[in-house]
Amino acid sequence: MTKLYKVLIIEDDFRVAQIQEQMVNDHPYFHVISTCRTGGEALDYLSEKAAALDLILLDVYIPDVKGLELLWAIREKFRDVDIMMVTAAKEVDTVQEALRGGIIDYLLKPVQKEVLHQRLDAYVQKRELFGERRQVSQEELDQLRQVQVRVQVGETPLPKGIDRLTLEKVVNALEEAETQGLTAMEGARLIGASRSTVRRYFEYLIHTKKAKAEVNYGDVGRPERRYFLC
């Protein structure tokens, strides 16, 4: 039976905090046990209640702290609590620093409930994978990575010429290919589309940093692009 994960929201705008709380509580496996509006309030709360928490939803723009100071303070003192950023901060430096701070996810406001629930589902799968185990296999870690890729693909607004159903087929084909990867021709045979169509989807996945390509040279020296999931 899946446990009920307890959540703290750190958000200075009480209206946004209320919306986030409702969205989280609408998920069957999560429950918000408190909200904090300042860094000082959050650290005081965590000093007493961190052991009861599983996850923090954290904004970057908190009035009494600068930048990601609160993230680092939480990470230094309360390492057993996972952190998911939910913020309007889009700066690359901010995102990179947050990732170095060990966050489990980074969501940009405004966040739709469906997207948040997808990320929470992925979090549940990760927690259940680790559970009380002392060791995991490489295959299990690969499956976890594939879940994360599917979540990201499912939530991204798609440009013209990219169909979600076809995109999912392409991602599934790359998953099955694993470390061997696929050429556009091989992908076309697997999903029943033209080579140019499959190449377009492969290049889209590269553009969104969910896939990569390597150039190989065949027996006659012709370059061949082979695609892999990141």
Curated annotation (Swiss-Prot):
Name of a matching Pfam family: HTH_64
Name listed for the protein in its UniProt record: Transcriptional regulatory protein CitT
Main location: cytoplasm
Organism encoding this protein: Halalkalibacterium halodurans (strain ATCC BAA-125 / DSM 18197 / FERM 7344 / JCM 9153 / C-125)
Signal peptide boundaries: none
SMART domains the UniProt entry points to: REC (SM00448)
Gene Ontology CC annotations of this record: cytoplasm
GO molecular function: DNA binding; DNA-binding transcription factor activity; phosphorelay response regulator activity
Domain Response regulatory: residue ranges: 6-124
